Amino acid sequence: MSSKRGADPDWKTPGKASKDKRPKTNAKKQKFRDEEYCKVCSDGGDLLCCDSCPSVYHRTCLSPPLKSIPKGDWICPRCIPLPGKAEKILSWRWALDRSVELRTSKGEKRREYFIKWHGMSYWHCEWIPEGQMLLHHASMVASFQRRSDMEEPSLEELDDQDGNLHERFYRYGIKPEWLLVQRVINHSEEPNGGTMYLVKWRELSYNDSSWERESDSIPGLNQAIALYKKLRSSNKGRQRDRPAPTIDLNKKYEDQPVFLKEAGLKLHPFQIEGVSWLRYSWGQGIPTILADEMGLGKTIQTVVFLYSLFKEGHCRGPFLISVPLSTLTNWERELELWAPELYCVTYVGGKTARAVIRKHEISFEEVTTKTMRENQTQYKFNVMLTSYEFISVDAAFLGCIDWAALVVDEAHRLRSNQSKFFRILSKYRIGYKLLLTGTPLQNNLEELFHLLNFLSSGKFNDLQTFQAEFTDVSKEEQVKRLHEILEPHMLRRLKADVLKSMPPKSEFIVRVELSSMQKKFYKHILTKNFKALNQKGGGRVCSLLNIMMDLRKCCNHPYLFPSAAEEATISPSGLYEMSSLTKASGKLDLLSKMLKQLKADNHRVLLFSQMTKMLNVLEHFLEGEGYQYDRIDGSIKGDLRQKAIDRFNDPVSEHFVFLLSTRAGGLGINLATADTVIIFDSDWNPHNDVQAFSRAHRMGQKKKVMIYRFVTHNSVEERIMQVAKHKMMLTHLVVRPGMGGMTTNFSKDELEDILRFGTEDLFKDGKSEAIHYDDKAVADLLDRTNRGIEEKESWANEYLSSFKVASYATKEDHEEHDDYNNDAENTDPFYWENLMGKSQPKLPKKQKKQSQQSQVDVESIMGKGKRIRKEIDYSNQYPSPNRATPSSIVLM
């Protein structure tokens, strides 16, 4: 038999029309169109020709082999149409024997790719031969191969047909949640009489929703379909069958609400009282601020309050809840646990996802902004959960809805009536407003007024009159008057008042010495800024702030200066050399000793810094020491943040340290599994530090919490705390107009005083007595029988305790003494000249050269001193220094 195709005149390629029916081509083109040899074995003979490509095959070379010649059109395995458009390649493996991919007579292995299809759920992922993928998605395959090891698959080949979800899906990067039905959001009738259901999957965006058939073998789908049908049925009869309210809103809950008892859930007594107060306020039409201290469950109280309105027939919504993006997941969990019958829609995601929500989740009927404005829409959902950003971005749509209630979590976003969030949200149509904040009086009286103005613009509409009425809130009559105004609108309780059985906390200031390297840098920062410091009449405030910021960096670690980091010794692993890294900073040296003991005693640590670059240095340190850790800062968003929290809180977690930036670590984070808090550098704003240690000292904590605040001895850090704390304690209530905000309230004299603090000892030739932490000192420091002043509330809470309204009495002030000297450290106008000018007499040439070389050595690390540049106002990046002070401290 001839090796050429068609040698046998009686054998014709099945399914092919005669050659004369093919498009006529010249011989040269025909050569490239039809192959002459089997695609598999490269031999000739009786060959089967594909109707879709030029390839030809022996029947026996196909896998599985063809027993007979197929009738009609036939296409080879390579050309079999794909089930859909490939979205991405998840993994690859060597083809198994049962594959329909081609085998070679030489036994060569063929690859298969695990494909996620566009518009289809992960349940429909399947293995596709490499040949098919190369034909239809060559660029996708090439991209996958570039970033993957294609020599051997990362996972062992196993049988995936046994129904084992791990072997079929999880091992290839598919999360279990992506296979769980969250809810059915719509349906569509098929022409053949069947029904398709649009399914929203857990932890996936709405644009990942997919159409599924009821007959599909997907766990939980039938139950979700039943709930969907029940919701549609109840929605249709909602207006005509609305039941009368079962419980009077003015009646206070004396026990757990019935719907919580039935679910086996239980509130604390103070939370029951909070829910009752919210219900009463709703009934009276009084907008409110729930200002409980952080960690007392404002989220849960709010959810139960809304659920009580729903369950008792007072209101079915719609309720709008606006929260930080980082807390969305936590709100979803609490709503699902405490209010399972509320239909909650999380309105986040890209344009496509939000379009899906608007189309399928707003109503069972077709909706338009016109019908919503005219209040003709029967809403499908009860609660819409969204972030601040989408309140503004989609105001044209969301602003058309008549909201029964608005809840704003972390309501300090409304402290300025000039903010976009404030202005846009004020235009929404809202029946009742509830603001949640743990720090209602964070800065000044003006910010409090703006919160009240947002709640009730008709009642609180004149800022000047409000400020004039409360010019001095330290006076008893003005405090009393302020209480009368706030009483209907605000409720605040403290942990010390309502959680008597909660483990105590002890906070300590830990004074730390500068290392020799830090002292050299500290001196250089001062000397290179001699001209700015020595200006008669005082330097510019902005210049002094810049100097202070450089000194604060120096107090943390010299490696925060780029040139110093570049000169640092790097280990083969790419990390800083550990000994040099640790010894360069007095704080890090002490931290190293503390962590060793804390790890040995099975404690877990939250480590805060307000500088994200310092967190980078701490990461190098933790990796070098071999400690497992998690990290959250402002760049880590959404579900990644929640995953880190869940990972750390896992009962079997090996993670020892949680790194947090002070600002990012204060919102919606529960880390009560940690019992030690170390504040590496204090924030300007004391509320942020209070929020920081409240991550651990909150409901759910079972151990005493130890809080250590590092402060560099005889430095700007120490003086800032003394000056700021004294100013805040003098005012008692930080609500005086003009205080706080983003501009500093430190005068030039105070700034100069802060910069001078400790410099005499620094520039002395002799050695002063230094604080040293040996093993015994560290053990004493970590002794958990030590007591701070936890029986006192922090000053930050003392001033807020004056605003405990409803039936909550004001606590008496605690007398407190500190080392602050009311007089400036040194008011000599020639101070810097005397310190640095006269202390550097004219030197002989040889000594002068050595001195200059020494200066060059420092400059090679830090830079060549002050250059002409635009002044940078660091007060735009850091809160005002006048707000920085520790709470409940013991000086070590």
From Swiss-Prot:
The protein's UniProt keywords, in alphabetical order, are:
Activator, ATP-binding, Chromosome, DNA-binding, Hydrolase, Metal-binding, Nucleotide-binding, Nucleus, Repeat, Transcription, Transcription regulation, Zinc, Zinc-finger
Give positions of region: Disordered: 1-29, 839-892
Q: Does the keyword Flavoprotein apply?
A: no
* Domain annotation Helicase C-terminal: ranges: 590-739
Which residues take part in binding ATP?
D292, E293, M294, G295, L296, G297, K298, T299
Reaction(s) the record says it catalyses: ATP + H2O = ADP + phosphate + H(+)
**Pfam families recorded for this chain?**
Chromo, Helicase_C, PHD, SNF2-rel_dom
Q: Where along the sequence does the record place the motif called DEAH box?
A: 409-412
User: Which stretches are tagged as biased composition: Polar residues?
Assistant: 874-892
Domain (Helicase ATP-binding) ranges? 279-458
Q: Which Gene3D superfamilies match?
A: 2.40.50.40, P-loop containing nucleotide triphosphate hydrolases, Tandem AAA-ATPase domain, Zinc/RING finger domain, C3HC4 (zinc finger)
Q: How is its activity regulated?
A: ATPase activity is stimulated by binding to DNA or nucleosomes, but is strongly activated by nucleosomes.
For bias kind Basic and acidic residues, which ranges apply? 1-20
Q: EC number(s) on record?
A: 3.6.4.-
Q: Whom does it interact with, and what assembly results?
A: Monomer.
What is the annotated role of this protein in its UniProt record? ATP-dependent chromatin-remodeling factor which acts in nucleosome-remodeling by catalyzing ATP-dependent nucleosome mobilization. Likely to be involved in the regulation of transcription.
Protein name in the entry: Chromodomain-helicase-DNA-binding protein 3
- Naturally occurring in which organism (per UniProt): Drosophila melanogaster (Fruit fly)
